[in-house]
């Protein structure tokens, strides 16, 4: 169990909002840290629903734990969800990593300095970070193979390619997504001052021309579309994020991801 006094900073992604609040995040020790997230909050701003196809099992996008395990030359990131991770679309057949529907973005703020990082989320997430919590690195955990992910980054996020990390190893084990990253890509081994935020999304093999392999959220759910959002494409395309453990974490998440202009094409 983590104690509040030992928590590290947690970045709070605000959906197309001008500011986000800084919170402590994860506990420090010689082996890294583990942060738990409440269950049952895989609803984005509180209204989102899963696609209707049976492959999107309840809990598939519900983060329960985030863990960072540093090593001498590489770091392992682990994102655990509420249900066992499966591979219904046979990812090895298309060069994938052994799972199909989940995708996670791990944002890292290494300095907490204004204007030193990126405030915008990756294309298709529709989120924005506050100026003093802009991310300096982001690790993409995708079922798509590295060649496909790097190609998408080059086409849709080339301006940030030096900050985007495609892991050397991506795999799933039980309920956990695992990414192994060279510390050199992070700018060095993880530090106790770093801040983190994880966005849980869904892998879309046929994304919108501007979206980086992300699945859209519409007003009504469909076979392969989340529902409960907006068809104007200005809502956050995020099912779950990390929130601080004090108070009502789910309520805080819903507030954060509700900060967008509804029923309009304007952000």
Language model features with spans:
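Short, flexible loop/turn elements at secondary-structure junctions
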Residues: 81-83, 110, 173, 183-185, ...
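Short helix-loop boundary/capping segments
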Residues: 137-194
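Acidic/polar low-complexity flexible segments
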Residues: 28-36, 110-124, 187-267
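Extracellular structured ligand-interaction cores
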Residues: 63-65, 72-76, 101-105, 164-178, ...
